């Protein structure tokens, strides 16, 4: 390192030098990136979940699976969601009872929300959820899809960041943060996502275009099945001067 490099910030004031911070350009492990800065959804869809290092960071019950998007020259694109008799949903025995669509404007976000797990009365929440997702995770017939809301999400336009946090009792509170591409951005990040009840999830629009998503739910929508957590980001408050004016009598 040259003398010049050692005194690189000599031209700044003392206060400015104290305030300086350096960006960390190191690429962390998958576990670090998944919980902090986020990873491409395609990396998760391609991951071998049988490996211990993947199992240790994956939220039980979450599914992230690749979708094929076919460009049709001079027309647009064509993409499949799911097939009833093959793929992830067929494997886990989940077929939505309701399908819906949503549009999120650019620069907007959907705050954390969560759906309540259905717990049989003869057992505790901790024991039941550990049985479903730790002790007997391949026994999909145990899952009470008709009594709790599971979400299946697809993005057909734009780019979005999804953040999941497991808040189920009896399970580790893991975090999964990843980026999904809509069908108009053909890439390995064109995926479908399954979110179990008890896993809080938030969505933030990336970039300058609106996000359009299509999602299915294992039950018909019921307002009491949706709990909000840290969702203040959804409220666009009026300017203070407007609020003062409206409060005048």
Regions found by a protein language model. Give the residues of each.
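Non-catalytic, conserved peripheral segments adjacent to functional cores
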Residues: 3-189, 208-212, 217-249
């Amino acid at each position: 390192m040259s003398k010049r490099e050692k005194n690189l910030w000599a031209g700044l004031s003392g206060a400015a030098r104290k305030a300086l911070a350096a960006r960390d350009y190191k690429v962390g492990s998958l576990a670090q990136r998944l919980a902090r800065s986020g990873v491409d959804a395609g990396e998760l869809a391609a991951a071998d979940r049988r490996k211990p290092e993947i199992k240790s960071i994956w939220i039980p019950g979450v599914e992230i699976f690749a979708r094929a998007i076919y460009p049709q020259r001079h027309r647009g694109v064509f993409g499949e969601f799911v097939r009833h008799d093959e793929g992830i949903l067929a494997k886990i025995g989940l077929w939505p009872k309701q399908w819906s669509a949503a549009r999120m404007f650019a620069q907007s976000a959907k705050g954390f929300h969560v759906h309540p797990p259905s717990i049989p009365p003869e057992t505790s929440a901790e024991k039941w959820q550990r049985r479903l997702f730790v002790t007997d995770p391949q026994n999909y017939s145990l899952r009470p899809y008709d009594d709790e809301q599971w979400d299946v999400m697809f993005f057909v336009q734009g780019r979005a960041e999804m953040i999941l946090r497991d808040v189920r009792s009896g399970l580790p509170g893991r975090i999964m943060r990843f980026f999904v591409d809509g069908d108009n951005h053909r890439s390995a990040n064109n995926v479908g996502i399954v979110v179990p009840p008890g896993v809080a999830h938030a969505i933030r629009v990336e970039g300058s275009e609106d996000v359009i998503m299509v999602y299915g739910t294992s039950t018909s929508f019921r307002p009491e099945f949706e709990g909000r957590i840290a969702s203040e980001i959804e409220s666009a408050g009026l300017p203070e001067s407007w609020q003062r004016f409206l409060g005048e009598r």
